[in-house]
């Protein structure tokens, strides 16, 4: 049976047992920002097991795409060097949500393995949790597995219920014993049965795990029986395929045989020649193309953090192993086509995204091959001395200057038996960060110590708060009892309507005052998570700790800022709609003037795409829908599908913002209705880093002023061209075409002028040791005419060294040429550099032709006069 047939047989078997076939969820969890990648079949059913979600079925079966390449589940370093480690794999599973339990689960597993897959019964071993007598009895008495092939596994991880055969979702919650099924590859393979001292050998291989969730563990560690126990099982498709195809390694199954052949062909074509078909590097490449492709399909692009970083690390590891085999140009992306042939039918989303996946990987390869070329040369040089440790400074230089990741350096070193000085690397990294902080913008939180009451924020509802008490005053970074007129101060209040900078939104400005004192607030930032510092200048009186002030936010500044913040949410949603679900926020800055939004995307936006985003957002604005903000438990926010950023730390309760069709977690301030935004206009789109784009946009009166300015510019052009505004593009195109024609005519005239001068220069050539030497200035020539005239003179003088110069706009252009028969004696590059240095410049080139420039025309005459002497010394 092929892998595809085994996958299908598994799903059809459980469908015949009343299970709903459920499609694989994406490898990127859509509702769990704490989970890097989907790493088990049960991930998509987590809320069902916890009781937060109800499904219309109580039995399910899946073939789940999984990735284990980061965090606790990280198999990356082993991939390619063992028979069964992968970054991407498929987990076949069957699930019972309070329906059947141990007896049926075990019976189904046995029936599938022995009757459908026809595995010999005497080749199968099982393990059970030591205290799970029920599972033991089912295996022994009902299924008929002999006692000598049933192994009880107790608490073997240093604590109660800490066992390979006891599964827990977390410190609390659903948990229970599990039973694992092993296949015996036979005595010719080293290794002992599970639970024995030699269990880590390859003879006995786990192929299926059945978890029986029958307890709920409370915070005290007490186990309470669940009223409706459930079943969660997982069987790796690659492992069971290896067993059924009678091969020992997963890399020998049909799916990998095809990918390995494609990998070898691609690597060989990229410069390897004839790579070793059994090389671990080919296995790395074949494995990694699966992980990379499915990750990109589900919306991730290579980056420097989170999932994007893991994707980049996997892709670059695969590329480097091709480089190790001899590949010297991009090859990795070409394997996507073969992967689609192998898995596109089972996962149609892969086939649909083939072109996009290929292009993303191609771009990453092109960037990384340049990085490899620079970094490997330095690393090889550092390792050539034979030291057993690579110093941290060198590792950091590779990382910081050449973009060579530390893990890649560690991979290369590990293969040479060399360790990396991690402590030295960390010290260099820390030093750089400290230097960057010292050179960066002052943040009021730096160095301000505060131990008073928290600040209560009232700014969602009000722009004014009366009766705010001063709890701390800082001047020049130090806590003081008071600040007087003229002081630049930071003032902490117990209650405030001022929004403190957070989530990309800048802090509010405004005014603090009482009967005798006044402070102009320029910025508001957080000293601590719940303590707001109001930074400004005392303009009247004196502000003391304990004073009571009235706090008033600058309403116009806030209104402009909230328009820009609210439109950022609508723009994010529109970008995902236009460009794809892979778009993810990477940074933002929202102030009163504009919004700046950085997001993951691997190509510049077209004018049509920008126009579509503008149309979608402005349609949302015209709908004038009300904005709703709610504080909800995190679990409820997840169920509502609120967008959240991976890697962000959220509390038990979160603020969910609904604006138009967007639903995100956000603590910022926003408009009451979408119509309050007024107008939305994108003013710039650019790239800020590999795989990161930036959009800048404006709203409201700023957008109106921008459009009016553009209209004024067009009107001015129309007047100059004596045309109607609608005719401006056509008129400009006609003028540009006329300009191009005139430029061609001018260039031709310059060429003729230079050529005519060249004929007159032949008589100026002097004989220097059998070589004709000519150094002269042309008038009215450009760079092309200079080169053309030089070529004509070389042809006519036969054996010569020539320097021609032209002065235009206060700058000197030089061209030097040496005929082929004389380049052994005189080099054009050296000659032109000699002349250029005398006119304030430098240059170089090939032995027969070289160009240079200079900034000092006054020295040109003497420089040209020195050419014959210079040639004479070398000829």
From Swiss-Prot:
Which positions are annotated as binding Zn(2+)? 565, 569, 666, 670
GO biological process terms, semicolon-separated: alanyl-tRNA aminoacylation; negative regulation of DNA-templated transcription
Q: Does the keyword Thylakoid apply?
A: no
Instruction: Show the PROSITE patterns listed in the entry.
Output: AA_TRNA_LIGASE_II_ALA
Q: Does the keyword Nucleotidyltransferase apply?
A: no
Among CDD domains, the record links this protein to: AlaRS_core
Q: Where in the cell is it found?
A: Cytoplasm
Q: Which cofactor does it need?
A: Zn(2+)
Q: Which UniProt keywords apply?
A: Aminoacyl-tRNA synthetase, ATP-binding, Cytoplasm, Ligase, Metal-binding, Nucleotide-binding, Protein biosynthesis, RNA-binding, tRNA-binding, Zinc
Query: What note does UniProt attach to the cofactor annotation?
Result: Binds 1 zinc ion per subunit.
Under which EC number(s) is this enzyme classified? 6.1.1.7
Spell out the GO cellular component terms annotated for this protein, sorted alphabetically and separated by semicolons: cytosol
**What Gene3D superfamilies does this protein map onto?**
2.40.30.130, 3.10.310.40, 3.30.54.20, 6.10.250.550, Bira Bifunctional Protein, Domain 2 (3.30.930.10), Threonyl-trna Synthetase, Chain A, domain 2 (3.30.980.10)
* Family the UniProt entry places it in: Belongs to the class-II aminoacyl-tRNA synthetase family.
Domain text: Consists of three domains; the N-terminal catalytic domain, the editing domain and the C-terminal C-Ala domain. The editing domain removes incorrectly charged amino acids, while the C-Ala domain, along with tRNA(Ala), serves as a bridge to cooperatively bring together the editing and aminoacylation centers thus stimulating deacylation of misacylated tRNAs.
Described purpose of this protein according to its UniProt entry: Catalyzes the attachment of alanine to tRNA(Ala) in a two-step reaction: alanine is first activated by ATP to form Ala-AMP and then transferred to the acceptor end of tRNA(Ala). Also edits incorrectly charged Ser-tRNA(Ala) and Gly-tRNA(Ala) via its editing domain.
Name used for this protein in its record: Alanine--tRNA ligase
| Source species of the chain | Methylibium petroleiphilum (strain ATCC BAA-1232 / LMG 22953 / PM1)
């Amino acid at each position: 049976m092929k892998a595809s047939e085994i996958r299908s047989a598994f799903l059809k078997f459980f469908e015949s047992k009343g299970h709903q076939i459920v499609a694989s969820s994406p490898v990127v969890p859509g509702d769990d920002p704490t989970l890097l990648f989907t790493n088990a079949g049960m991930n998509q059913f987590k809320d069902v097991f916890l009781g937060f979600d109800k499904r219309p079925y109580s039995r399910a079966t899946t073939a789940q795409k999984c990735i284990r390449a980061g965090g606790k589940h990280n198999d990356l370093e082993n991939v390619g060097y063992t028979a069964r480690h992968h970054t991407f794999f498929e987990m076949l599973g069957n699930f019972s949500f309070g329906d059947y339990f141990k007896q049926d689960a075990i019976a189904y597993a046995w029936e599938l393995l022995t009757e459908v897959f026809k595995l010999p019964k005497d080749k199968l071993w099982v393990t059970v949790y030591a205290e799970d007598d029920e599972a033991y009895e089912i295996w022994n008495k009902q299924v008929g597995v002999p006692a000598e092939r049933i192994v009880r596994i107790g608490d073997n991880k240093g604590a109660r219920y800490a066992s390979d055969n006891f599964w827990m979702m977390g410190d609390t919650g659903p948990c229970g014993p599990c039973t694992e099924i092993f296949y015996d590859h036979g005595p010719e393979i080293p290794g002992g049965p599970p639970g024995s001292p030699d269990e880590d050998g390859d003879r006995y291989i786990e192929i299926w795990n059945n978890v029986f969730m029958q307890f709920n563990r409370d915070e005290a560690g007490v186990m309470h029986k669940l009223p409706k126990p459930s079943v969660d099982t997982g069987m790796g498709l690659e492992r069971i395929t290896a067993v059924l195809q009678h091969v020992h390694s997963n890399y020998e199954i049909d799916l990998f045989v095809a990918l390995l052949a494609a990998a070898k062909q691609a690597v060989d074509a990229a410069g390897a020649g004839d790579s070793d078909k059994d090389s671990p590097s080919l296995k790395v490449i074949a494995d990694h193309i699966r992980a990379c492709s499915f990750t990109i399909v589900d919306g991730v692009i290579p980056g420097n953090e989170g999932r994007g970083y893991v994707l980049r690390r996997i892709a670059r590891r695969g590329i480097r192993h091709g480089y190790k085999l001899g590949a010297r140009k991009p090859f990795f992306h070409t394997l996507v086509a073969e992967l689609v042939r192998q898995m596109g039918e089972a996962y149609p989303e892969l086939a649909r995204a083939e072109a996009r996946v290929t292009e993303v990987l191609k771009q990453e390869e092109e960037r990384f091959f340049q990085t490899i070329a620079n970094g490997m040369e330095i690393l090889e040089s550092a390792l050539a001395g034979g030291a057993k440790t690579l110093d941290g400074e060198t590792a950091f230089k590779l990382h910081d200057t050449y973009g060579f990741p530390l893990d890649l350096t560690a991979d290369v070193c590990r293969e040479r038996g060399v360790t990396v000085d991690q402590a030295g690397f960390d010290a260099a990294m820390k030093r750089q960060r400290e230097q960057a902080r010292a050179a960066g913008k002052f943040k009021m939180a730096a160095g301000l110590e505060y131990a008073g009451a928290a600040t209560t924020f009232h700014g969602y509802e009000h722009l004014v708060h009366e009766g705010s008490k001063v709890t701390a005053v800082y001047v020049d970074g130090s806590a003081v009892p008071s600040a007087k007129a003229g002081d630049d101060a930071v003032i902490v209040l117990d209650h405030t309507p001022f929004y403190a900078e957070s989530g990309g939104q800048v802090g509010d400005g405004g005014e603090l005052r009482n009967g005798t004192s006044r402070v102009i607030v320029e910025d508001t930032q957080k000293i601590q998570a719940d303590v707001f510092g109001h930074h400004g200048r005392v303009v009247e009186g004196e502000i003391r700790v304990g004073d009571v002030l009235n706090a008033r936010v600058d309403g116009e500044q806030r209104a402009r800022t909230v328009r820009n913040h609210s439109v950022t949410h609508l723009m994010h949603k529109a970008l995902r709609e236009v460009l794809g679900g892979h778009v993810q926020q990477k940074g933002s800055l929202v102030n009163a003037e504009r919004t700046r939004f950085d997001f993951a995307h691997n190509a510049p936006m077209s004018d049509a795409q920008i126009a579509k985003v503008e149309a979608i957002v402005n349609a949302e604005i015209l709908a004038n829908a009300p904005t709703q903000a709610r504080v909800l438990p995190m679990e409820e926010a997840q169920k509502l599908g609120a967008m959240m950023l991976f890697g962000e730390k959220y509390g038990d309760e979160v603020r969910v913002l609904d604006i138009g069709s967007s639903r995100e977690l956000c603590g910022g301030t926003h408009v009451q209705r979408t119509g309050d935004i007024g107008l939305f206009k994108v003013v710039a789109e650019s790239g800020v880093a590999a795989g990161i784009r930036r959009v800048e946009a404006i709203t409201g009166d700023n957008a109106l002023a921008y459009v009016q300015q553009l209209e004024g510019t067009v009107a001015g052009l129309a007047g100059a061209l004596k045309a109607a505004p609608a005719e401006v593009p056509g008129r400009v195109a006609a003028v540009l075409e006329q300009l191009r024609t005139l430029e061609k005519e001018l260039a031709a005239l310059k060429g003729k002028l230079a050529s005519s001068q060249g004929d007159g220069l032949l008589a100026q050539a002097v004989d220097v040791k059998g070589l004709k030497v000519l150094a002269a200035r042309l008038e009215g020539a450009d760079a092309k005419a200079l080169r053309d005239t030089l070529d004509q003179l070389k042809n006519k003088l036969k054996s010569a060294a020539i320097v021609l110069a032209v002065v235009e706009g206060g700058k000197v252009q030089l061209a030097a040429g040496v005929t082929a028969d004389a380049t052994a004696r005189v080099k054009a590059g050296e000659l032109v550099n000699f002349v250029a240095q005398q006119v304030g410049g430098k240059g170089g080139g090939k032995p027969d032709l070289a160009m240079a420039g200079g900034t000092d025309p006054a020295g040109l005459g003497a420089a040209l006069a020195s050419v014959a002497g210079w040639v004479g010394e070398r000829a």
